[in-house]
Amino acid sequence: MDKLINKPQPLTSDISTSGFIYFAVVFVAIMGYLLFKNLLFLFFFKRYPKNTPKIGVGNITTIAMIIAVAVSIVLVLMALAGGLAAALFRGYPGFRVTLELILVKISGLLFGPIVGIFSAATIDFLTVIFSGGVFNVGYVLGAILTGMIAGILREVLISTALLHNRNLSDFAYLVLSIGMVIAAFLITQFFVLGISNNLKEIKGDEEFRLKFNAPSIVFELSLTQYANILLYFTIAIVIAMLVLYIVWLVKQRHLSFEHSRFFYRSYKHANHQFTLFVLTKENWFYLILNVITLASTSLLMINIAFIPIFDTQTTGQTYEFWLLARLLFAPVIFLLDIIVIYPILLLLTPLMLKGFKTAVSKNQRKTLKQSFTDLQSVVLPIINKRKHQQLRQEELKRLARATHFDLTEGEMEKLLVEFKTITQSFDRVMNIDTTSVEPMYAPFNTSPTPLRKDKVIVEKHPEKLLANCKEMSVGFVKV
């Protein structure tokens, strides 16, 4: 009996101290990376990079919109669920923080780590004020770390975009993304095992086991099993990234020009017999890789390693209970990040790419070969305006100088061949003789990108209409 009374018990303050140390280490590491990147830019590119986007009405509006949406989600849930959500947010503030972090990730990914810090702190303060929840400094620090991690992912993408070789840029971004996931796994393992071993020594247990004791669920794991689950999750994420990269390589090899970097789809048009190059913007590789990297990294470093420390302060449960609870709900949190963040980024991709292009191209030296995206924006209007003319070499050189990069003679010749191939597909269409062909009034749209705006006059029985067409002329159907 005396043994039980005198047995030392783990103190919550000791665990929270470890959390503050964890925050300080990760914060210093992220700031050190930003400092190293800035020095690298100064040494190689002779310029100081900006870690925040240009302040403007559009960016400020978007940041405010993201903050407002994050706060509104919490308030809407409280209104729909009545007192249940309010009681849940007050009894378990970690649930509220988990919802907040989704929008914090989007803000950091769009605008960088500095804006991510500001958005995270603002979102947490406002949700506590309007929802009447429990304020905990640990949750604020967790949101700040999430915004910084998302912002670092943006900085990595900007850094790899400076490489003039597209394949090298894609591979570098893949390697850095995998490195972030592996680093998050190692940090989580080291931190969780360190705290658990300390608690095991305090309790005097021979084996420290994680126990989840809910009214209808009794579940427990050893530390070894817990570590293996995190390891298998990390391996699965890395394999998914590699498969995504292989699919991207195979797809872009057939759907892009090497030098001009036009992405295209080649298909037989429904209204004529010629094949057209339809220029598209294929950004799905970076978008999906962004979401997977961000979701897995924040899940490991924040939801599993950091937040359970402060869950013990706001609830009556132990640290090992929240470790296991967060692990059990990890698949739901991961899928929720993917489902919510991906479509939002899909809508905001033009804004994100605009920020990337601005950060890459501003004050860039002419000797540095930047992405041909800027050249596309200048050349495409000329192609559309003068489809029947071939771009002259002197004109292309002038456009290249206007977009701040130099071309060798060999690159110039290859680039001209690519532009010629692109414009020839339009030239063939321009030469179609349609003087004796009346417009086709189709009952439905027969092409994803029609050349003409055909008028729909028949809504029923389109099969009979096409089967009984009067004549065919140069690929056109006359009805």
From Swiss-Prot:
Keywords: Cell membrane, Membrane, Transmembrane, Transmembrane helix. Its main location: membrane. InterPro entries: Asp/Glu-ADT_sf_sub_c, GatC. The chain crosses the membrane at residues 25-45, 63-83, 110-130, 133-153, 175-195, 229-249, 287-307, 328-348. It comes from the Bacteria. Pfam families: GatC. It is found in: Cell membrane. In the C-terminal section; belongs to the GatC family. This is Uncharacterized protein MG098 homolog. It comes from Mycoplasma pneumoniae (strain ATCC 29342 / M129 / Subtype 1).
